[in-house]
């Protein structure tokens, strides 16, 4: 009997491996999670990332429209999947490339930009922050740092681990990274799903000290925020949030929020856009339990970069306005987003929400996707485009 069982064991194990392989082959992609049967025939799918950045001559910068007095120019190109930008103290612009797994340094050489790869083979690096000569990099599973990098661009220093007690989930696992007014390092931990009750470790904005100690949660119920900034005067944390998919093409709206104090819950997965209970997880709950959105920014617009303008080049009324870069939708028949929006906060009144730059979407065709902004020392504004692999510069002259 024992011999028979042992002889049969390889067959059983082989059959189990075959079943597992078949199950994996038949499993839907993660972006389809939560799709109702009524939308099973939908042809909507994420927009594929181009295999290479566009050549400078192929980038139609003239199609980007901005208010009168403003001008857009191509500042740098050939940066595959250009995402988050942060300045070094000596004038180096560091740029992340999530899909390429690289981090770049862009150096201005007398009006010409030279791009150098300073880190490669990383795990979906997105967030970058710089302080006291140190570049901090956020991957899916860890935060690292490169000490003295601006003096070693041609021979980058080894990456040192700052914090690595992070989930490894790929869905919404990429992170934004920024230093707050308190000197702490803030980052997001997205929900590991389209819609689910996430573990307590997910769907939040968190912070640590620069040495990786003192981890704590700042905001809860945040499905996926990959961009935030602090008000220059009040020091309150403002952030953009991507809402769930497959509830409809026109709902729910993405959000622009303010964490006026630590510990607020912003509704995920129970309430969407502040007034829609989730049909599955919202039963027995009320949207009044959660912090409402400051602005409903639109369905599936995918707001990423959030930045308060503090420069002096733009007109005086632009001071302390917020630029919100929207990467754009994939799950709407009529595309939305693909713009840089502007938010004017008004005491005692609803914020003003308007277009600042648009043109990456032409009819139903896209040629670029604005994802993040970063001010220059002279007050001009850089816009990163991860689809074209380019960075644009917006200037103003009366």
Which ranges hold each PLM region?
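Beta-propeller domain segments
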Residues: 27-67, 174, 191-194, 208-213, ...
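Surface loop/turn motifs at the tips and blade-to-blade linkers of beta-strand repeat domains
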Residues: 74-79, 117-121, 162-169, 217-221, ...
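Beta-rich catalytic cores
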Residues: 81, 99, 114, 121-124, ...
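Conserved beta-propeller blade signature
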Residues: 92-95, 134-137, 184-188, 236-240, ...
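A short loop-to-beta-strand structural motif that recurs across blades of beta-propeller domains
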Residues: 102-105, 142-144, 204-206, 255, ...
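Asp-box/WD-like beta-propeller blade repeats and closely related beta-sheet repeat scaffolds
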Residues: 115, 124, 129, 141-180, ...
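Blade-level signature of beta-propeller repeat domains, shared across WD40, Kelch, NHL, RCC1
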Residues: 374-398
């Amino acid at each position: 009997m024992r011999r028979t069982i042992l002889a049969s064991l390889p067959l059983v194990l082989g059959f189990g491996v075959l079943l597992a392989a078949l199950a994996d082959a038949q499993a839907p992609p993660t972006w389809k999670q939560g799709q109702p049967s009524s939308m099973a025939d939908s042809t909507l799918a994420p927009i594929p990332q181009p295999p290479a950045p566009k050549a400078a001559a192929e980038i139609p910068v003239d199609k980007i429209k901005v208010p009168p007095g403003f001008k857009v120019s191509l500042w740098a190109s050939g940066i595959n999947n250009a995402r988050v930008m942060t300045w070094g103290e000596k004038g180096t612009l560091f740029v992340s490339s999530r899909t390429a797994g690289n981090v770049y340094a862009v150096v201005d050489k007398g009006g010409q930009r030279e791009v150098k790869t300073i880190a490669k083979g990383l795990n979906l690096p997105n967030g970058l922050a710089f302080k006291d000569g140190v570049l901090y990099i956020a991957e899916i599973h860890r935060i690292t740092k490169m000490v003295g990098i601006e003096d070693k661009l041609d021979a980058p220093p080894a990456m040192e681990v700052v914090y690595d007690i992070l989930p490894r989930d790929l869905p919404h696992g990429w992170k934004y990274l920024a230093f707050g007014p308190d000197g702490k390092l803030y980052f997001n931990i997205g929900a590991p799903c389209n819609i689910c009750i996430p573990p307590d470790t997910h769907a939040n904005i968190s912070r640590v000290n620069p040495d990786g100690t003192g981890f704590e949660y700042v905001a809860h119920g945040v499905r996926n925020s990959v961009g935030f900034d602090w008000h220059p005067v009040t020091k309150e944390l403002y952030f953009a949030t991507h809402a769930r998919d497959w509830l409809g093409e026109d709902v729910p709206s993405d959000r622009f929020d303010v964490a006026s104090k630590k510990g607020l819950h912003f509704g995920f997965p129970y309430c969407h856009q502040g007034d829609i209970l989730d049909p599955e997880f919202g039963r027995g709950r009320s949207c009044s339990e959660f912090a409402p959105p400051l602005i409903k920014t639109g369905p599936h617009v995918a707001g990423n970069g959030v930045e308060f303008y503090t420069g002096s080049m733009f007109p005086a009324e632009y001071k302390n306005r917020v630029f919100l870069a929207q990467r754009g939708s994939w799950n709407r028949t009529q595309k939305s987003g693909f713009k840089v929006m502007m938010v004017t906060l008004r005491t005692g009144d609803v914020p003003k929400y308007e277009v600042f730059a648009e043109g990456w979407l032409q009819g139903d065709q896209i040629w670029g996707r604005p994802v993040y902004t970063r001010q220059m020392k002279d007050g001009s504004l850089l816009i990163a485009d991860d689809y074209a692999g380019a960075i644009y510069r917006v200037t103003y002259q009366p």
